[in-house]
Amino acid sequence: MALLVTVLGLSIAAAAGASSVTQLILAFSLAWGLVELGLRTSLAPRLVGLARRERVLLVLVAVVPALEVASRRDALADAEGWRELAPRWVDRARLARRVAIAPPLVVAGRAQTFFVRAEGAGTVRVGFEGEDAIEATSLGHGVFRVDATPRGVDRSREDITVTISVDGAVHDARLLHHAPVPHPRGIRVGDQHALCFVSEESGEVFFGVLGALRSMPVTGGPAACAFVGGAIWVAVRDEPSLVTIAAEGSVAARGPAIGRGAVAMASEGTKLAIARSGERRELVVLDALAGSELGRARVEGVPLEVAFAGDRIVLTTRSPARLELRALDGALLASRDLVMPAAALAASPRAIAIATTAFDEAARDNLGNHFVEDQLVWLDPRTLAPTRVVPTARRTDRQDHAGDADRGLGPAALAFDDDARLYVAFVSSSELAVFSPDAPTRGVDLGDRFFGPSGVAIDGDTVLAGSAIDGALVALDRHSLEVTAGARVAPTNAELLREAPRLLQVRLGERSFFEGTRAGASCHSCHLGGSTDGEAHNIGGRVLAPTLDVRGLAGTAPFLRDGSYARLGDLHDVAVLEYRGYREPAGDRRATLEAYLASLPIPVSLADRDVVREQRGLDAFVRAGCAGCHAAPAFTTLARHPLRTIFPDHPGDAASSLDVPALRNLRGQEPYLHDGRARSLLEVLTSANAANRHGDTRALSEQDRADLVFFLETL
């Protein structure tokens, strides 16, 4: 009877196109009923008394409907939510181990902070393959912190085993391993056609001439370089002092300590201006050769770029989006609030230019709060008053839809020449364009050389353009825009396919992240450089939400505020469904986008280390009930909660849910919470938690809250 029910049930399911568990249950229930009916009729003896050969034949007949039902397993998985649950189960199982470590990603040569949960443990030591074990710092409540810069792992490995010794008992964990290829950024030009640029991803500084480039490892994350006095000066993100590279290639730390957290640097003569976002946000101005500090000033927002405009310094920030003009001693001379932060900056004594996705407040109000319109804005170098605004996105005959755009997308780097012409690298449409004060705009497609130029510099009659994504540079004649030379510092796609296929997946996913969609926007439009623009947007919804940083997402499924995306690769649907997809096919974009996003590490916190205060902060974290949802070691349980149970004043759909985020990399990510209501972490614990449902923060003293904020900023 079981055989008959199975055969008949599969046949009914196949014929009906069953694609859910409910439909399968109905099909087999109907089959069972029909067989029962048959057994009560004269057909029963014949069915029950089938010969062995006839039974085998019946089984073979069942193969066809079985295969038909099996072919719809993906639809079945989607209908029942199994596809969504699978990644979450995997990540939860990893975090639920008695001894667990997070994040699940090790980046070669990159400083990282890992957390281990080992309840009741006294001593924890963590060993990465090829490295001596590191003793972890106990923060209390079974939570341990490990600061490491793994260097001994074979760079070809895609995953590695990490050993965790807990009071002598050894536990193993398997973590993803990523060894980034060089990403040339921040091209600077010196005398006699010398150039330099940094690759923070691979921890290198490149220098020389285009046809004979050399590289030198610089620990701590080289963030920017500049030529001063015949030497190359390098600002390092994780180290407090500048690094210099002499002509013969020797390296030495020099000059006054500026503090950790350098993000940008510019030079003018012997002067250096460094923007930093470490334990403090500051602009530091030095006379490099004299070794003296000319000025140091606090900055309210998160610094993005810095440039000299003659005897003045221009600084761009996000959170708030702002353009600032400062004197050499750091004093604020003028400022201008922006609708969206500047994605690129160039300055000269005659003009300042920025690239942004929205400069005109009225246009943004009229066209929606997720409106993206790439624009170039020229401003007066004395008053910051705008003198010219040029939307750059445009449509060519390659597009089918009137609203589509495929040129002038994603201006990522700007440079002025001596004739006030502005050269613009468009990362999202792979082109270089020249905007002149008194001549038509000219441009050249660089797509046949590399994808996504993200750097540009002027060297006499030569324009240098570089692609961080493809690891390549070209030189162009400044007048004709013809390519005259090229160089490569990273492997080609063909070399990666042969030697490191996963790194090719990462590169192709990075391309999808920066590539413009038919609607003219890209992931980079809001997630500047993989981080955030610090603004609140919506994508197809009614409620604004702050842009999330996309670094450190590996192992934290599901994704987005409501957890509606089960896999990182599923975020590709945003580009397809909301922005009409891409013009060019590029293989399995889901898989490559997932590979890229999973390769992005959590930045090391640059907050001051104070173990005693961290321990007090974690204790307040536990007493307030934060660990109930944000449990170590990932500081999330990967659960969802109805929004109104936590924020009863939430104006959206009462059924809206909130995916519990991991509380890593919070420093400098304001605004906070699902709707950006908190402008600081302290507000998260006070005014933004008026109902006291987002943790029992009322039970904390003022000192407790200060310690808790300190702890959160170190994660």
Where does each model-flagged region fall?
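Proline/serine/threonine-rich low-complexity linkers at boundaries of modular beta-sandwich domains
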Residues: R83-R98
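Internal/C-terminal transmembrane anchor helices
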Residues: L50-R72
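Hydrophobic alpha-helical transmembrane segments in integral membrane proteins
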Residues: P65-A86
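Cytosolic-side transmembrane helix boundary signature
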Residues: F28-L58, V474
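Membrane-embedded alpha-helical segments of integral membrane proteins
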Residues: L3-R40
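Predominantly soluble domains enriched in secretory-pathway, periplasmic, or organellar proteins
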Residues: R52-R53, W89, G109, T113-E119, ...
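Low-complexity "stalk/linker" and mucin-like segments enriched in Ser/Thr/Pro/Ala/Gly
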Residues: I101, E129-H141
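Periplasmic c-type cytochrome electron-transfer domains
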Residues: R185-G186, I245, A321, R326-L328, ...
